[in-house]
Amino acid sequence: MNKKTNERPVFPFTSIVGQEEMKLSLILNVIDPKIGGVMIMGDRGTGKSTIVRALVDLLPPIDVIENDPYNSDPYDTELMSDDVLEKIKKNEKVSIIQVKTPMVDLPLGGTEDRVCGTIDIEKAISEGKKAFEPGLLAQANRGILYVDEVNLLDDHLVDVLLDSAASGWNTVEREGVSICHPARFILVGSGNPEEGELRPQLLDRFGMHAQIKTLKEPALRVKIVQQRELFEKSPKEFKEKYKEEQNKLMEKIINARKKLKNIIIKYELLEKISQICSELNVDGLRGDMVTSRAAKALVAFEDRTEVTPKDIFTVITLCLRHRLRKDPLESIDSGYKVQETFKKVFNY
């Protein structure tokens, strides 16, 4: 059974001109959500939110338990709410429906209660029940959580989002009452670097960092304007034109997810990734792990079996540029340092 919703038409992902760096980062995160999300920084009006919304249309629908606010997975106990788990244990019948992969927008003025959910303490004390009103993290479970202008969001709230994205769980505690529910989502943040960067400690926790720039070539700019006009004139007709390409890309993503666990990366390549991280003075081991994961996701996407140095070169800038130590007044490196170190280590 499908849940029908009236949704505004979304610009097709395969019709988007340029911005390959951002598109690749998003696709790799969809193939392997354990990469840890993506931070997209770029000028205003460069299509950041358009591309993120377009991505959701490429994702296959998911099976959920009907009327469950957490998008519980009927087949995976790790992705079930306590209520659903209780019903399954008691062999109670649950209704399964199919819905689009959820995408949740976090508004800039969002509060912690709105994001995490709230506990009705009075009801909990008077009736002895855990009265919980789920928040945006519950809605985003098994989907994408998009935060535009994440660099303007309160640091504490960004921390909460990153904690949930990393652990796959959201825990709310009030007055000794505690609620825990699955919150496994891909975190996508975007912002304009002119309005300030995130603190390095928070930035480091995003798996990848894509930079998006205003296209300079007149021919490409004209093409974008024309496509936008055609889409606004007749969204259905425009989407139909790209239907075959969209389906092919969706199929590639589904196949890549299945192949991912069988992708091989040789020990010497892992060693060289770590050598690059070490020479760049990257703190911690996140950079090493994310680069390896992203390279494997790329190989799966391209329907191959083994990671090559070229695959690492393709993804390593996206995985490391935001982890380099820098002067507070400097902007994030475009990738020159990472690429030069890669070439030196790999004799590339």
From Swiss-Prot:
What keywords were assigned to this record? ATP-binding, Chlorophyll biosynthesis, Chloroplast, Ligase, Nucleotide-binding, Photosynthesis, Plastid
Which pathway is this protein assigned to? Porphyrin-containing compound metabolism; chlorophyll biosynthesis
Q: Which Pfam families match?
A: AAA_lid_2 (PF17863), Mg_chelatase (PF01078)
State where it is primarily located.
Answer: plastid
Task: Name the top EC class.
Answer: ligase
Localization terms from the record: Plastid, Chloroplast
| Record has ATP-binding as a keyword | yes
EC annotation from Swiss-Prot or TrEMBL: 6.6.1.1
Annotated Gene Ontology MF terms?
A: ATP binding; ATP hydrolysis activity; magnesium chelatase activity
Q: GO biological process annotations for this chain's record?
A: chlorophyll biosynthetic process; photosynthesis
Chemical reaction(s) catalysed = protoporphyrin IX + Mg(2+) + ATP + H2O = Mg-protoporphyrin IX + ADP + phosphate + 3 H(+)
Enumerate the SUPFAM superfamilies for this protein: P-loop containing nucleoside triphosphate hydrolases (SSF52540)
Where on this chain does ATP bind? G42, D43, R44, G45, T46, G47, K48, S49
Q: Does the keyword ATP-binding apply?
A: yes
Entry GO CC: chloroplast stroma
In the record, the note on similarity to other proteins reads: Belongs to the Mg-chelatase subunits D/I family.
Name of this chain's protein: Magnesium-chelatase subunit ChlI
